């Protein structure tokens, strides 16, 4: 929740989106933590890539 709150504080009206938490399609490298359910892919609700670090 702290990351989502930080996003809302930095950019009012923008929400954090989790786009993938488990990879069953093989989109990540073989060593990816997505296969263990220990990684997530995130974006912002406005999908403004200039906000991504």
From Swiss-Prot:
Binding sites annotated in the UniProt record for Ca(2+) 1: 19-20
Protein name (Swiss-Prot/TrEMBL): Tiggy-winkle hedgehog protein
Family matches, as PANTHER family: HEDGEHOG, PROTEIN HEDGEHOG
Residues the entry annotates as binding Zn(2+): 34, 41
GO CC terms in record: extracellular space; plasma membrane
Reported function: Intercellular signal essential for a variety of patterning events during development. Involved in dorso-ventral patterning of the brain and in early patterning of the developing eyes.
GO biological process: cell fate specification; cell-cell signaling; proteolysis; regulation of gene expression; smoothened signaling pathway
Key word Calcium present: yes
InterPro entries named in the record: Hedgehog, Hedgehog_sig/DD-Pept_Zn-bd_sf, Hedgehog_Signaling, Hedgehog_signalling_dom
Species in which this protein is naturally found: Pseudorasbora parva
Family: Belongs to the hedgehog family.
Domain of life where this protein originates: Eukaryota
SUPFAM superfamilies: Hedgehog/DD-peptidase
Subcellular location, record wording: Cell membrane; Secreted, Extracellular space
One annotated GO molecular function: peptidase activity
PTM entry text: The C-terminal domain displays an autoproteolysis activity and a cholesterol transferase activity. Both activities result in the cleavage of the full-length protein and covalent attachment of a cholesterol moiety to the C-terminal of the newly generated N-terminal fragment (N-product). This covalent modification appears to play an essential role in restricting the spatial distribution of the protein activity to the cell surface. The N-product is the active species in both local and long-range signaling, whereas the C-product has no signaling activity.
Keywords: Autocatalytic cleavage, Calcium, Cell membrane, Developmental protein, Hydrolase, Membrane, Metal-binding, Protease, Secreted, Zinc
The organism's taxonomic lineage, starting at the top: Eukaryota, Metazoa, Chordata, Craniata, Vertebrata
Positions contributing to Ca(2+) 2 binding: 20, 23, 25
């Amino acid at each position: 929740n702290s990351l989502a709150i930080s996003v809302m504080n930095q950019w009012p009206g923008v929400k954090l989106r989790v786009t993938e938490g488990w990879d069953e399609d093989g989109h990540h490298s073989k060593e990816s933590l997505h296969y263990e359910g220990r990684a997530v892919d995130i974006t912002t609700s406005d999908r403004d890539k200039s906000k991504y670090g």
